Each structure stands twice: as C-alpha cells, then as structure tokens.
C-alpha cells in the first residue's frame, strides 16, 4: 500500500495541492473524513474515508470520527519496535506516516458577538488535538502538519530527501504541541468567564497561563545586544496588532513600549475632552496639553518641553489633520498615533518618510492585567482604572479651589497617573509646565518639576502620585507660586502639609487614591 497520510482540516487552504502532490508524486494513500474527504473527492483526488478504513461509522453527529485503534495505532506505532510491528499486523493496521490536521475555529467562534455556550462547546475539537498529540509524540516516525504554511516545506523535504528529516519532524512536533496548548488555554479562559457570569471575572486564577503567537521578530530589544520578539494574544488582532502603519519602518521594541505609554495617557482625554496631544520619552510624558484645535494642542504639548520632545512619541485624541501634520513634520519624531488620519495629512507626512505614523481607532482599549517577570516566576496585577470623581475628593485646606483651578487639578491628576514614581506634574492652562519623574524622593521630583516650569508655575497647580511624607514639598510649591495641589493624602504628617498650604494660601485636595508606577 505504500505510505499513508491522514488529512482532517477545517482550513482548506492548500489542501488540494498538498493532497495531489502526495498522491501523484509520492504514491501516498490518503485517509480522510467529513468535509475534508468531500473536498478531496470533489477535486478528483482518490481518498479512503476513515469509516471505510476502520469499519466503524461516524457517530454522534460527527463527534466521533477518528477515535479508533486503527487510526491511533497507525500513528503511535514505533517502526523500530518488533512488538509494535507485530501488533499492527495482528490488527490489520497500516502505519500512518503523515498527519495533517488543523482544529475547529474555537477562538474565532467565541470572538463573535452573542455566541452561546452551546455554540462554543460544539467548536471544541476532540479528535483533532488527539491526532495532533499522537503524531507529535511519535515524531521520530511520523510528520505532523498543523498549518498550511508548512505544506510546501514538507513537500520539498520529500523531493530532496525522500522523507521528512528528523529536524523537520521535531520542529513540526514543537509547533503542534504549542498549538494544542494555545487551543486548550483559549477553552479554559472562555469557560472560566462563563463560570463567572454574573460575578466579577476571575483575572487572578490559581493557575495563570500566558501564551502568544509571534507576530514579529524585532531588530533588538531595549538595547542592540538584546534579542526580542513581539507576541500577540487571541485569535483576532487587537491592540497594537490591530494598528495600521501608514508609513515608516517596522516598529521597534522601544517604540511599542512608548506607544503603549502614550496610549495610556491619551486615553484619559477621549470622549468629550477637547483636542489633546501627548508626547512620550522613555515611557514618561514630557508634554501634555489640550487646545481649541488639534494642531494647537500638539504645539502646546511640544512647547511644554521642546528639548525632550525631540525623538518622541506623539499620541493624538482626534483624527490627524493637515495642519497638525504640518506641525509634526517640523521636528524629528519617532512615532505618531491617532484614531484616524485625514487624506489631506498623508502627502504632508510623506515629507518625513522615516516618521512612523499609525492609526488605532480603539485607543481606549487597555489590557486587563499587567505582568512583570521576576526570578523564578512573574507577578500579575489587575489594571483597574479608578474613575476620576471630584465629588469624592476632599478639600483639606481653608482655601477651596475655584472651578477653574479644580479643572486644572483634574488635568494634572490625569497626567501624573502615568508618570514613573516618584512623580510630580506642574500644569497651567491645561498644559504641563514641568514634570518630575522617577525620583527616589518626592521633594526631589517636586524640585525638578518646579525648576522645569520656572515662572509658568506661578498660578498653576501641582499633582503628586503619592502623599507628601513631609511639608517640604508644599513649602517648595509655595515659594514657586503654586495655587493648588492635588495628592492622595494618607501620610502620618498630613497635618504638617495642610498647615504649610494654609500658611501660603494654597488650596489642597486629597483624592484618597495612590498612583504609584514602577
């Protein structure tokens, strides 16, 4: 009978071409079932159905097709074991040399709106993973193909060597087990959500699985000596994988980190917010501003720190228009992202071909968890943005902020949440004037922010991501002419900071929300 191949695919791409080559060039006998057998028969390719071969019909509406000793014995038999060979002969089982399987589209099914649990359950493949795992386990003797991209490489192996080489079979087995692991994880995650219906979703389960598909091998990581890859989760592109790169080179590791930081800040200014722009350097905002128009917002964000903005990452909360494109091209920028891009902007942007320009309509869509590796494991925390609710804030000083100052405090609070701790933001007229980021002591961050702001601090506001342990930060703010302060509160010495604010006539608001960022 010669060599035998079992083909059972939900994705018919390249199937007929592979099957025809197996039969015509290499004399394979083909086994198949269901829709795959019909596709081959329609193409005029000789095929034996699994039911004909095993003598057992498909049952349970097709739920049981390939789960049979004649199938799995043929796949799992070790060709170098006389006892295995004897067992095959005794049971009239033919060795199966090639298994070509891909799985029911479970992830694609659950991604559809309003899918029912019953519909999802029917897309849980049983026979497919069983075939794949059996063939992958016996890769010393069997080749398993789980993706159409492998078909031509396998045929080349046959044409060059007469059979697939051990290294190729091992690589195929690795890909096969990765596929089944990813598939099972998608099922487990879905059922976990279904189980949690009506309750808070469990995002910190006792066993936490993380898998991703490699989207892109990056040129390098944070530094040229570090290798890096970009992986995506889920069946459909989302987040940055769904962004459209309009121009410029492929994204780098640092670009992606900075873009995500920019997305986080600009997401604070969506919805009914005025036009806004954010400029990021090394994942920290260096300029954030609102404006009457998008170009005004960008120019004000740029003016907030012209030096740091060079080579920065820009995020906009409105479609990129021609006037803003013109302003963007006046300096060197690594990346620009907006929810959309107007046609008038495209020819202007092309004058800066190295500037990466992206559109991402869903700038607001954030991950639900943050993951950080440590030696021997990793940490997972929920990303649960706290709503900005001034009604829940507490004015702790004799002086209350005016409505205009309260609006400014809200603006500064939105920004400071996204600055590395210890973090201080000084703003005035909806424009950051000075940002102190990543300092080991809070008063040091205050001094940096006030120094950067200079005279622009006078009449402005100061936001802190954590409480003031001493009154020195408030005293420094008073000397610079700060009119209002917003901070979490909660220090043992809060009374000293309040006293210093009262002495200077500064309004101070406690949010009771800390926003450390490491």
UniProtKB/Swiss-Prot annotation:
Q: Which residues form a coiled coil?
A: none
UniProt cross-references to SMART domains, sorted A to Z: AICARFT_IMPCHas (SM00798), MGS (SM00851)
Q: In which pathway does it act?
A: Purine metabolism; IMP biosynthesis via de novo pathway; 5-formamido-1-(5-phospho-D-ribosyl)imidazole-4-carboxamide from 5-amino-1-(5-phospho-D-ribosyl)imidazole-4-carboxamide (10-formyl THF route): step 1/1; Purine metabolism; IMP biosynthesis via de novo pathway; IMP from 5-formamido-1-(5-phospho-D-ribosyl)imidazole-4-carboxamide: step 1/1
> For the MGS-like domain, which residue ranges apply?
1-146
Segments passing through the bilayer:
none
Keywords (A to Z) from UniProt:
Hydrolase, Multifunctional enzyme, Purine biosynthesis, Transferase
| Encoding gene (name) | purH
Please state which protein family the record places this protein in: Belongs to the PurH family.
Entry note about domains: The IMP cyclohydrolase activity resides in the N-terminal region.
Signal peptide residue numbers:
none
Which Gene Ontology cellular component terms are annotated? cytosol
Record's protein name: Bifunctional purine biosynthesis protein PurH
What reaction gets catalysed by this protein? (6R)-10-formyltetrahydrofolate + 5-amino-1-(5-phospho-beta-D-ribosyl)imidazole-4-carboxamide = 5-formamido-1-(5-phospho-D-ribosyl)imidazole-4-carboxamide + (6S)-5,6,7,8-tetrahydrofolate; IMP + H2O = 5-formamido-1-(5-phospho-D-ribosyl)imidazole-4-carboxamide
Q: What is its EC number?
A: 2.1.2.3, 3.5.4.10
Domain of life of the native organism? Bacteria
């Amino acid at each position: 009978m010669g060599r035998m191949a079992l083909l059972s695919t939900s994705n018919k791409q390249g199937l007929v071409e592979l099957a025809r080559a197996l039969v015509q060039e290499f004399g394979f006998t083909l086994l198949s079932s269901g829709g795959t057998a019909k596709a081959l028969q329609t193409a005029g390719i000789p095929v034996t159905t699994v039911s004909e071969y095993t003598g057992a019909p498909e049952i349970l509406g097709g739920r049981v097709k390939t789960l049979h000793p004649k199938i799995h014995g043929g796949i799992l038999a070790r060709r170098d074991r006389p006892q295995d060979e004897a067992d095959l002969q005794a049971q009239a089982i033919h060795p199966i040399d090639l298994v070509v399987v891909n799985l029911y589209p479970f992830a694609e099914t659950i991604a559809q709106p309003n899918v029912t649990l019953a519909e999802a359950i029917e897309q849980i493949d049983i026979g497919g993973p069983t075939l794949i795992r059996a063939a992958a386990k016996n890769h010393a003797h069997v080749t398993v193909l789980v993706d159409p991209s492998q078909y031509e490489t396998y045929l080349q192996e046959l044409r060059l060597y007469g059979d697939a080489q051990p290294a190729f079979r091992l690589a195929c087995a690795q890909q096969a087990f990765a596929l089944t692991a990813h598939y099972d994880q998608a099922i487990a995650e879905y059922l976990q959500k279904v189980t949690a219906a009506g309750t808070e979703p469990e995002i910190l389960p006792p066993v936490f699985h993380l898998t991703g598909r490699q989207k892109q091998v990056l040129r390098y990581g944070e530094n040229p000596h570090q290798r890096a890859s970009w992986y995506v989760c889920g069946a459909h592109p989302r987040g940055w994988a769904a962004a459209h790169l309009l121009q410029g080179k492929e994204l780098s590791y640092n670009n992606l980190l900075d873009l995500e930081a920019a997305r986080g800040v600009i997401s604070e200014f969506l919805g009914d917010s005025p036009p806004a722009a954010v400029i990021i350097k090394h994942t920290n905002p260096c300029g954030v501003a609102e404006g009457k128009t998008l170009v005004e917002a960008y120019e004000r964000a740029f003016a907030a720190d012209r030096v740091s903005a060079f080579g920065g990452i820009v995020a906009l909360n409105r479609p990129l228009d021609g006037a803003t494109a013109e302003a963007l091209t006046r300096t060197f920028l690594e990346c620009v992202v907006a929810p959309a891009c107007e046609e008038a902007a495209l020819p202007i942007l092309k004058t800066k071909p190295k500037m990466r320009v992206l559109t991402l309509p869903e700038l607001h869509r954030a991950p639900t968890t943050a993951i950080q590796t440590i030696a021997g494991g990793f940490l997972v925390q929920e990303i649960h943005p706290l709503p900005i609710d001034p009604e829940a804030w507490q004015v702790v000083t004799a002086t209350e902020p005016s409505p205009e100052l309260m609006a400014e405090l809200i603006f500064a609070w939105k920004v400071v949440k996204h600055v590395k701790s210890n973090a201080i933001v000084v703003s005035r007229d909806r424009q950051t004037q000075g940002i102190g980021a990543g300092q080991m002591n809070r008063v040091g961050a205050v001094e940096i922010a006030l120094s950067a702001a200079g005279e622009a601090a006078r009449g402005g506001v100061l936001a802190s991501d954590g409480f003031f342990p001493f009154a020195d930060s408030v005293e420094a703010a008073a000397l610079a002419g700060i009119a209002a302060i917003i901070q979490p509160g909660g220090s043992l010495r809060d009374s000293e900071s309040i006293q210093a604010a009262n002495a200077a006539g500064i309004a101070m608001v406690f949010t009771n929300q800390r926003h450390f960022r490491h």
